[in-house]
Amino acid sequence: MSSTSSPTYTISKTLNTNYPLIDNDPHFRRVIGYARPSDYVHGTVAGAAGPGLLYLMEKMAPSGVGKGGFPKAMRLATAVGFFGGFLYFYQRSILRFYGMSENAREVQMDMREMVDKVKAGQPLYGVSTLPVDVQGMAARQSRYSALFFAVLPWFNFVNHNQHGVDTAKYYQQAERELEAERLGKGSSS
């Protein structure tokens, strides 16, 4: 009996959305890097809402907790607001990767980033030192995880190649661009 094993991949389901899927398990850095200025604004407003409302309520109807009570409540509200604002910011950005909100800008950014990596001969989704089976486990655990953010915030920090998209489009676009560059250089000489 042979004890060799081949890597097993679980084909991920693709959700039916109005916009194209970019990546169903984007790396944390990509989600932050592709965020729009409006995501930062929404996250900041959501984060400031907690301490802002607590301050407003204290001014409108003082709680009378005594010296030192209100600052502790404000520190807690600020910490909760900071994490809540960050999660809202992150979720707005990652939902565009899933194709659940308008993502034309991100589709172009993704195509440019991946085609540049193909041209440079780099792996599309980074290099990982983890074994393939551990990469697969990480992919299965964090795929579409932002849909469950309200219960359990879960991020992808692992480089792997299981992202639910056909990567052939990147290689085909790189070939077209390289051919256009070659023809452009040939006609100019």
Curated annotation (Swiss-Prot):
Signal sequence, renumbered to the chain: none
Record-level Gene Ontology MF annotations: NADH dehydrogenase (ubiquinone) activity
Primary localization class, coarse: mitochondrion
InterPro entries to which the protein is assigned, alphabetical: NADH-Q_oxidrdct_subunit (IPR053229), NADH-UbQ_OxRdtase_su21_C_fun (IPR024549), NADH-UbQ_OxRdtase_su21_N (IPR019721)
Recorded topology in the membrane: Single-pass membrane protein
Locations listed in the record: Mitochondrion inner membrane
PTM comment text: The N-terminus is blocked.
Keyword line: Membrane, Mitochondrion, Mitochondrion inner membrane, NAD, Oxidoreductase, Translocase, Transmembrane, Transmembrane helix, Ubiquinone
Catalytic activity from the UniProt record: a ubiquinone + NADH + 5 H(+)(in) = a ubiquinol + NAD(+) + 4 H(+)(out)
Gene Ontology CC: one annotated term: mitochondrial inner membrane
Summary of the function given for this chain in its UniProt record: Transfer of electrons from NADH to the respiratory chain. The immediate electron acceptor for the enzyme is believed to be ubiquinone.
Protein name as catalogued: NADH-ubiquinone oxidoreductase 20.9 kDa subunit
UniProt organism field: Neurospora crassa (strain ATCC 24698 / 74-OR23-1A / CBS 708.71 / DSM 1257 / FGSC 987)
Gene: nuo20.9
